[in-house]
Design a protein with these regions (language model features):
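Helicase motor core with emphasis on the C-terminal RecA-like subdomain
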Residues: 28-32, 36-45, 49-53, 57-79, ...
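A conserved SF2-helicase RecA2
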Residues: 371-410, 414-418
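Short, low-complexity, intrinsically disordered N-terminal modules
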Residues: 13-15, 78
Length: 456
């Protein structure tokens, strides 16, 4: 293997010239050949005149038939990395994704661009499923989206053998690892791809994977001498702000913050459906328009609220973790959490939906001891010993993150195996960058005394 680190900043010209994604490490078995013209289809279908350099290398790795592992931050352009080679190959890329709604959104967007794509899932009528399978066998699709559950069905492998498959792309690949923050047992079934399609390349894509999870992904998918593309986890345009709140502080601080962010979008994450509804009502009563988004809403209502938020009709959306996957909105100026996330990985992925345009954005965590206690209570209820141990480990790491006096950026990067050179990031509350509205006391509420734990 040839292992090297690219020594230049990778500029994302597809969204904003200020946005940079720095490569952490690139490992390839052999340099991919560069003859194929990729700029013409990139310009014709996506409207971009140039790549982010990591994107082009990933595309060429797949066109060269290499197994590939990609770790790239939220909003880094991972989807294009498998959509473009699928288009250029003239065959069908089979994309495995965990959420039906996300697959449907991507397939619809591709269809609007003139790229034939389809989703095969159980929500389709039997005749519609048969039609999709027939067109797939005829090679009419450039991308075919399946859930891991669908792939696990005994009949799926049989008819997939009749499809002209270019490669398999595993989205949200961290779901395959028991050490990942979103482990899904059905993802373990994906190991059968290597058995039944030994000659086809497999590509794994994720935004948040520690070294341990990355090794697990490679092992579970049985990737052969894979090309590895690991982008830097440092999002320098984001400001991480953490505050432990006393009983009456949290909602007052939320209102302060929303009145401060008058330009751009805001996502507010609440831990439960009830808290989503309560928060929306609280904000509306104070003259701040906000929309809810959670799993108990009717599908059309969720979709309508998402569209109103995306179209700039309403600035603030309050949701559970169900909101965000696949959302491509560059102008989010703040992501605010109203409870302690279950893990650093979850927080990094959700907070990373801010500032995708490369401009400054804030990631604010307003947590309370009661929510941390509730999280610990549910971990205590887990019956599987191994899963309980992993959950406690994730819990203690996120607690150290919020309690520590170490730079927030450094803590996040260290968690993913990356060391920042700067001791003082200048872009987090620990390094003295908290805005006045967040650091000022709330009237009538005794502020929480800062408690520091050892740095990570």
């Amino acid at each position: 293997l040839c292992t090297y680190t690219v020594g230049v900043a990778i500029v994302d010209r597809s969204s904003d010239p200020k946005r940079q994604i720095d490569p952490l490490a690139v490992t390839t078995a052999s340099p991919p050949k560069l003859e194929t013209d990729l700029i013409s289809p990139l310009r014709r279908y996506w409207g971009y005149s140039s790549f982010r350099p990591l994107q082009e290398r990933i595309v060429r790795s797949l066109l060269a038939g290499h197994d590939t592992c990609v770790v790239m931050p939220t909003g880094g352009g991972k989807s294009l990395c498998y959509q473009l080679p699928a288009l250029v190959s003239g065959k069908t890329a089979v994309v495995i994704s965990p959420l039906i709604a996300l697959m449907q959104d991507q397939a619809a967007a591709l269809a609007q661009m003139g790229i034939p794509a389809a989703v095969l899932n159980s929500t389709l009528a039997a005749d519609a499923q048969a039609a999709v399978m027939g067109k797939a066998r005829a090679g009419e699709y450039r991308l075919l989206y399946l859930s891991p559950e669908r792939l696990a069905r005994a009949d799926t492998v049989g008819w997939l053998r009749q499809v002209p498959v270019a490669f398999f792309a595993i989205d949200e690949a961290h779901c395959i690892s028991e050490w990942g923050h979103e482990f899904r047992p059905e993802y373990r079934q994906l190991s059968r791809l290597r058995t039944h399609f030994a000659e086809r390349p497999i590509a794994a894509f994720t935004a948040s994977a520690t070294r341990q999870v990355r090794h697990d992904i490679l092992a579970q998918l049985q990737l052969r001498n894979p090309d590895k593309y690991i982008a830097s986890f440092h999002r320098s345009n984001l400001r991480y702000l953490v505050r432990e709140c006393a009983g009456g502080e949290q909602m007052d601080l939320l209102v302060r913050g929303l009145r401060n962010y008058r330009d751009g979008k805001v996502i507010v994450y609440a831990p439960t459906i009830a808290r989503v509804e309560e928060t929306v009502d609280y904000l509306e009563e104070r003259g701040i328009a906000a929309l809810p988004y959670h799993g108990k809403m009717e599908t059309e209502a969720r979709k309508r609220n998402q569209e109103r938020w995306m179209s700039d009709e309403v600035r603030v959306l309050v949701g559970t973790i169900a909101f965000g996957l696949g959302i491509n909105k560059a102008t989010v100026r703040a992501v605010i959490h109203l409870a302690l996330p279950k893990s650093i990985e979850q927080y990094y992925q959700e907070a990373g939906r801010a500032g995708r345009d490369g401009h400054s954005a804030d990631c604010i965590l307003l947590w309370q001891q009661r929510d941390a206690g509730l999280l610990a209570f549910f971990i205590g209820k887990i019956t599987d010993a191994a899963e309980k141990e992993r959950s406690w480990e994730r819990y203690h790491i996120i607690r150290r993150f919020v309690d520590s006096n170490a730079c927030r950026h450094r803590q996040i990067c260290l968690h993913f195996g990356e060391r920042l050179k700067r001791e003082d990031c200048g872009a987090c509350d620990v390094c003295g960058s908290a805005p006045g509205w967040l650091s000022a006391p709330v009237e009538g509420v005794r502020p929480k005394r800062k408690r520091f734990a050892p740095a990570v």
